[in-house]
């Protein structure tokens, strides 16, 4: 574990924030829409099952999603919301056997995903020693958010998620400030910046504020992103080969999945190296 992080209970495993597709009713393959693009081979409306979804709720082309034009599927991460909706909110009753629940189940899924994403950030914030001054508030927010995920389908669809997200975000901002303040040197403030295609090879971005930055196709090879705040940063097709992301704040698996990289990149221990990343030194 990075020295900038410390253990905390509950952690992401306790909160069920890892996707368990075997316990889900293929909700991301049905509930969400997508359009034919570089990420998806076809158009699909919300609520319509993807033609690749099998009767057992498994993907029929899972091993070949990228070559078949469905790279967007390999990027998506529900933070465990799929199995929570399937097994907890709807008690293991699937939308095929109980079609009357389908619309409500599909409406609940994106709400649950947002709540689980917030839980991911809050759980991470609670592992950060520098954020101890706000740990009590963070834990209270985590407990409140977790309680919301246990609500009924009706309660979840009626939830004002933006208002709750705003409350949580204020705490995450404070957490970020506390952690990045401990990083020596002048920190770059690039929140929401347009850095699409930017040449940042080898850049010193330690403690940088890159919240919501557009880093699409940016060259970040060998960049030092330790303790940089990457919440909401768009890393699609960014090259993270050889970059140091240890201790990066609020980085998610979906962001890594959307980027390019290699075996030399250093990642937070809570995240996995995407299967499509290259071996070290392979160009």
Q: Can you say where each PLM-predicted feature lies in the sequence?
A:
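Tandem repeat scaffolds
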Residues: 173, 181-283
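Hydrophobic scaffolds flanking metal-cofactor catalytic centers in soluble metalloenzymes
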Residues: 1-136, 140-167, 171-182
């Amino acid at each position: 574990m990075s020295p900038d992080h410390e253990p905390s209970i509950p952690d992401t495993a306790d909160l069920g924030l890892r996707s368990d597709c075997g316990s889900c009713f293929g909700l991301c393959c049905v509930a969400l829409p997508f359009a034919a693009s570089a990420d998806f081979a076809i158009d699909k409306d919300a609520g319509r099952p993807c033609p690749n979804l099998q009767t057992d709720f498994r993907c029929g082309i899972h091993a070949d999603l990228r070559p078949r034009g469905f790279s967007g599927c390999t990027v998506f991460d529900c933070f465990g919301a799929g199995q929570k909706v399937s097994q907890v909110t709807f008690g293991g009753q699937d939308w095929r056997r109980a079609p009357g629940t389908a619309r409500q189940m599909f409406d609940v899924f994106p709400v649950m995903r947002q709540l689980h994403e917030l839980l991911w950030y809050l759980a991470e914030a609670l592992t950060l020693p520098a954020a101890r001054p706000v740990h009590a508030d963070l834990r209270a927010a985590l407990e409140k958010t977790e309680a919301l995920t246990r609500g009924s389908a009706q309660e979840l669809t009626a939830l004002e998620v933006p208002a709750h997200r705003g409350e949580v975000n204020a705490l995450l901002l404070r957490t970020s400030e506390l952690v990045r303040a401990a990083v020596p040197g002048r920190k770059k403030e690039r929140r929401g910046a347009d850095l699409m295609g930017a040449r940042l090879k080898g850049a010193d971005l330690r403690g940088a504020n890159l919240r919501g930055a557009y880093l699409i196709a940016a060259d970040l090879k060998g960049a030092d992103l330790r303790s940089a705040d990457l919440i909401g940063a768009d890393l699609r097709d960014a090259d993270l080969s050889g970059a140091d992301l240890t201790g990066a704040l609020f980085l998610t698996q979906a962001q890594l999945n959307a980027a390019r990289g290699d075996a030399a990149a250093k990642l937070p221990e809570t995240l996995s190296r995407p299967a499509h990343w290259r071996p070290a030194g392979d160009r």
